């Protein structure tokens, strides 16, 4: 039976992310705003980091026009969960890149205004 031997430190580890020492600041220079948001539904709602906040579940109560073109200002790949009846203040950040939105709840389906 062959035995697998791993060197003390391979030069490449798949999926590894190497960063410089210190803090990493996210979304520097982008427009942000805070909104009070409440889950008016009877089930928990989880919203991911890159979901167009304007288009989240209709049970979420907040000023949708203020959220147009924005997403949660949280790390990529993470989410925020709202329990039924829960209210909290969230920070949103403007969507970047080409600002073209497709899918979600199909309220935009193209270039943001």
UniProtKB/Swiss-Prot annotation:
It is found in: Cytoplasm. Belongs to the urease beta subunit family. One of its GO terms (molecular function) is urease activity. Its main location: cytoplasm. GO terms for cellular component: urease complex. Gene3D superfamilies: Urease, beta subunit. The gene is ureB. Pathway: Nitrogen metabolism; urea degradation; CO(2) and NH(3) from urea (urease route): step 1/1. PANTHER family: UREASE (PTHR33569:SF1). It comes from Nitrosospira multiformis (strain ATCC 25196 / NCIMB 11849 / C 71). This is Urease subunit beta. Its EC number is 3.5.1.5. Keywords: Cytoplasm, Hydrolase. GO terms for biological process: urea catabolic process. CDD domains: Urease_beta (cd00407). Pfam families: Urease_beta. The keyword Transcription does not apply. It is an enzyme of class 3 (hydrolase). Heterotrimer of UreA (gamma), UreB (beta) and UreC (alpha) subunits. Three heterotrimers associate to form the active enzyme. It catalyses: urea + 2 H2O + H(+) = hydrogencarbonate + 2 NH4(+).
């Amino acid at each position: 039976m062959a035995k697998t031997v791993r060197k003390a430190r391979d030069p490449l580890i798949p999926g590894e992310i190497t960063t410089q020492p210190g803090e990493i600041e996210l979304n520097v220079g982008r427009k942000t705003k805070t909104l009070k948001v409440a889950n008016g539904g009877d089930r928990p709602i989880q919203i991911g980091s890159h979901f167009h906040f304007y288009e989240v579940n209709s049970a979420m109560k907040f000023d949708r026009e203020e959220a147009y073109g924005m997403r949660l200002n949280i790390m990529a790949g993470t989410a925020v969960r709202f329990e039924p009846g829960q209210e909290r203040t969230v920070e949103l950040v403007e969507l970047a890149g080409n600002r073209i939105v497709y899918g979600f709840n199909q309220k935009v389906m193209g270039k943001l205004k």
